[in-house]
């Protein structure tokens, strides 16, 4: 008998429901999706709405409202619950409030007997991923955050628009905090087989343009929040990408929130931060400790140190 893959989603807000929708229409290998939320009517409504579209799907998926007991035999628990950014707030402003929420959620999930993989999308995601690891006492490779996957997708979109190519032909990453201290790996960026440094040397793009592009990545969430109140479609797709990489054992490289403990120059230890990593059925197979330029390494140090300063203030 074939194994039935089961995912539990904790949080039926904009991000959670966008992920649930993306997963449902993706024809993935997930067979069962359980949705949990304190706002039970909201969660039940999302379940009903998704189920009413089953006729239009290539493959039906069992979707139900549930509780933490349903986590006991789940392969993956996705957490999107928590307070969202308000206009004018940074992601780091949410640390104290969401840490309290996560303590209750994570301990409830673990109490069910869950032994699968956590995927965290709540902000500030790098810190909430660390909080999940601490409260669950899970191995670090079994706790994953969405990290800078969304930031990287935004960057590749902007680069693709600028160079008039498909996003699949852009090879570049945003690393560091999913937030204001992130940085672009310009020195390693390629458009298909051609390095960005070659375009700069030829005068086909300028450093000023690239700086503006990174500012647009950093400010994207603030702009979307100002216009529509929250971001959820793109991150919903990002979570789905991570979940499918785990379920399908893809060995896919994504800039997720990974546990760093001495990589990239041994300058900061014991944090989660956005770094390209191999995602497989066991979670994080490997954090890719590849060489980045000195100027980018300095930005990574600054970003990591900022996250570490917040983590050190949390009492576990």
UniProtKB/Swiss-Prot annotation:
Pfam families: Ldh_1_C (PF02866), Ldh_1_N (PF00056). Allosterically activated by fructose 1,6-bisphosphate (FBP). The modification Phosphotyrosine is found at residue 222. Keywords: Allosteric enzyme, Cytoplasm, NAD, Oxidoreductase, Phosphoprotein. It comes from the Bacteria. Its EC number is 1.1.1.27. GO terms for cellular component: cytoplasm. Its main location: cytoplasm. Beta-D-fructose 1,6-bisphosphate binds at residues 156, 171. NAD(+) binds at residues 15, 37, 42, 68, 82-83, 121-123, 146. CDD domains: HicDH_like. The active site is at residue 178. It is found in: Cytoplasm. Pathway: Fermentation; pyruvate fermentation to lactate; (S)-lactate from pyruvate: step 1/1. PANTHER family: L-2-HYDROXYCARBOXYLATE DEHYDROGENASE (NAD(P)(+)), L-LACTATE DEHYDROGENASE. Homotetramer. Catalyzes the conversion of lactate to pyruvate. This is L-lactate dehydrogenase. It comes from Borrelia turicatae (strain 91E135).
């Amino acid at each position: 008998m074939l194994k039935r893959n089961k995912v539990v989603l904790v949080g039926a807000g904009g991000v959670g429901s966008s992920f649930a929708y993306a997963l449902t229409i993706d024809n993935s290998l997930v067979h069962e999706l359980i949705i949990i939320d304190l706002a039970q009517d909201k969660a039940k409504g999302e379940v009903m709405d998704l189920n009413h579209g089953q006729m239009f799907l290539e493959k039906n998926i069992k979707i139900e409202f549930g509780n933490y007991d349903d986590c006991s035999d789940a392969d993956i628990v996705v957490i999107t619950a928590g307070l969202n950014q308000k206009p004018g707030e940074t992601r780091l402003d949410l640390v104290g409030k969401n840490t309290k929420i996560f303590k209750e959620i994570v301990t409830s999930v673990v109490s069910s007997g869950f032994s699968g993989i956590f995927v965290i999308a709540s902000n500030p995601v790098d810190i909430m991923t660390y909080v999940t690891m601490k409260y669950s006492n899970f191995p670090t490779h079994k706790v994953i955050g969405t990290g800078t996957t969304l930031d990287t997708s935004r960057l590749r979109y902007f680069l693709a628009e600028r160079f008039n190519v498909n996003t699949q032909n852009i090879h570049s990453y945003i690393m560091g905090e999913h937030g204001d201290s992130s940085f672009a790996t310009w020195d390693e960026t390629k458009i298909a087989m051609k390095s960005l440094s070659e375009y700069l040397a030829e005068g086909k793009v300028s450093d000023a343009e690239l700086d503006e592009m990174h500012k647009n990545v950093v400010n994207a969430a603030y702009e979307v929040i100002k216009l529509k109140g929250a971001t959820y479609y793109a991150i919903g797709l990002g979570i789905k990408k991570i979940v499918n990489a785990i379920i399908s054992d893809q060995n896919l490289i994504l800039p997720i929130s990974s546990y760093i403990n001495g990589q990239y120059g041994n300058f900061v230890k014991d944090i989660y931060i956005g770094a390209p990593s191999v995602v497989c059925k066991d979670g994080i197979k490997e954090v890719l400790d590849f060489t980045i330029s000195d100027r980018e390494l300095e930005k990574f140090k600054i970003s990591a140190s900022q996250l570490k300063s917040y983590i050190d203030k949390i009492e576990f």
